[in-house]
Amino acid sequence: MINIKFPDGSIREFESGVNSLQIAKSISPSLAKITVGAYIDNKLSDAKDVINHDCELRLITTKDTEGLEILRHSCAHLLANAVKELYPNTEVTIGPVIDNGFYYDFSFKETIGEADLANIEKRMKEIAKKGSSISYKVVSKEDAIAFFKAQGENYKVDIIESIPADQQIKIYTQGDFSDLCRGPHVPSTAAIKAFKLTKLAGAYWRGDSNNEMLTRIYGTCWATKEDLDQYLHMLEEAEKRDHRKIGKALDLFHFQEDSPGIAFWHDNGVRIWREVEDYMRASNKKYGCGEIRTPLIADFSLWEKSGHASKYAENMFATKSENRDFAIRPMNCPTCVQVYNTKLHSYRDLPIRMAEFGIVHRNEPSGSLHGLMRVRSFTQDDGHIFCAPEQVEEEVILMVKQCFEVYKDFGFNDFTVKIALRPENRIGNDETWDKSEQMLKNALDANNVAYELLPGEGAFYGPKIEFHLKDAIGRSWQCGTIQLDFSMPDRLGATYIDKNGNKQVPVMLHRAIVGSLERFIGMLIEHYAGNMPLWLTPVQVAVMGISNHQDEYCQKVFETLEKNGIRAKLDLRNEKIGFKIREHTLLRVPYLVILGKSEQEQEIVTVRKHNGEDLGQMSIGDFCAFLNEQIEAKK
């Protein structure tokens, strides 16, 4: 007999050789139906893995985040299974889980389109209904290569050849279909019930444009049909709110192949940009952050010292000049440290807070680029705080307070906080990481801020607090970060003199509140479906006359609005008033001022909102006061 300890502390005896699925069934048949995996002594395992020793066990169900990931990854394999049955000559490549779903890349010998997805999905449902048991076997590297070579799966062979010699290789099988995978998977295809294939896209093998273009099929998978239906409805809403479409319709920005992944900002877009940047500049000043500006390009030796060259080189753009190697910065922190290093600092000077709207460039794969949400060049609202270890918690609390304030002002009232812990690829020793992670936990605990832990998700130089914002249709966006760093100040020679006259290395706190301004503006556009709050919208008021007889009065009203700090647009075109109203309504201008003979004679304005609500007539002075009151209140 073996002893199994459960998360609630209870211990039960089972026969040796039992598996997690059987244990779940012994507790409740309904629990077994939704069990898709388990943590056995904190190791993620398949639900049918045999247990022969005393252990701690946590069952994973489809209600858990990990359970959904297992379900979705299994659905990706179900997709590959269906494709191989329908298109036997197709080669399969990779099929990872992504947010809310999965994708799988295929090398088809024939051309397929969106219309083929329904047939593939139908076959997936047929396979799932068979309820084929899913199992795996561990094989040697040589046997795995031989197995997939025999099947003509050259991409799988390529993957296996790059697997380190000491890494375990598993082949999962369901029915007649086998695939390479680390797992875990659901116990049976019958567990995969609520899924939908959503779109096709192209993707280069291994993200390299020199390689073959593959066909990527995206899908989503959920625990229940109700969850799936809710998500599909959200997708419909998201389609309507797509910032790329709205950005084009409102003349905010555009992209073109001459500069892939880098936005061309138009006047209307720059107006929003300025409001966001000016707001953050004022917030930084309020919270004691001075502003700096540092070089975009630095000698490659700086990036070697900072650790970026060894940990981040594949994402960096490099260049050469006069026989010197340079890199365009992927992050702002090393150049900020250089500003700190220009002076001697005493413990009395700390904390020293520096903010920078720094442009960074990252060599993101072309297939991952997505409008403003994933770009190769963006401006980060970075802040770097140099402080003594005993000041860390107080500084983190202050930054958390600033983040909460900023998000609420921009209309995000629902957000969660997470702590991303040490990744596998990192600098610094475990003792330093232990101390860093505990400091962030202490700061949040002291401020009564609830948080989740994200193992392995920290930056290579330190753990970080993440702020995840929920938008108007329920999507979660990872936005701001607060990162604790003991390593970089030391590597770059940052010091201060302590009260005993000794040199010490300061702790460096990296923080970004809105993060990438490009991405944050994209989030705002989708959150508000283009109907931005008055204080953010590019044009706040459109002034128009019923006929050209009102042109002079329209000009006067327009100038008065401008003098009162209102962003107004004057429309004197010789068009029908209905046409003008429709056009400015489509452009999401919040307020329309319509002037006719009566308004001109009384020197008043008639105002309507872009949604058609009539606010009636008022003096221009009252209208300006009304607008400025809303702007001040961030409405």
UniProtKB/Swiss-Prot annotation:
Presence of the UniProt keyword Zinc in the record: yes
Cofactor names: Zn(2+)
Record organism: Francisella philomiragia subsp. philomiragia (strain ATCC 25017 / CCUG 19701 / FSC 153 / O#319-036)
Keywords of this entry: Aminoacyl-tRNA synthetase, ATP-binding, Cytoplasm, Ligase, Metal-binding, Nucleotide-binding, Protein biosynthesis, RNA-binding, tRNA-binding, Zinc
Role of this protein: Catalyzes the attachment of threonine to tRNA(Thr) in a two-step reaction: L-threonine is first activated by ATP to form Thr-AMP and then transferred to the acceptor end of tRNA(Thr). Also edits incorrectly charged L-seryl-tRNA(Thr).
Catalytic activity, as annotated: tRNA(Thr) + L-threonine + ATP = L-threonyl-tRNA(Thr) + AMP + diphosphate + H(+)
Oligomeric form and interacting partners: Homodimer.
Major location category of this protein: cytoplasm
GO CC term (a single one): cytoplasm
One GO molecular-function entry: metal ion binding
Entries under PANTHER family matching the protein: THREONINE--TRNA LIGASE, CHLOROPLASTIC_MITOCHONDRIAL 2 (PTHR11451:SF44), THREONINE-TRNA LIGASE (PTHR11451)
Name of the featured protein: Threonine--tRNA ligase
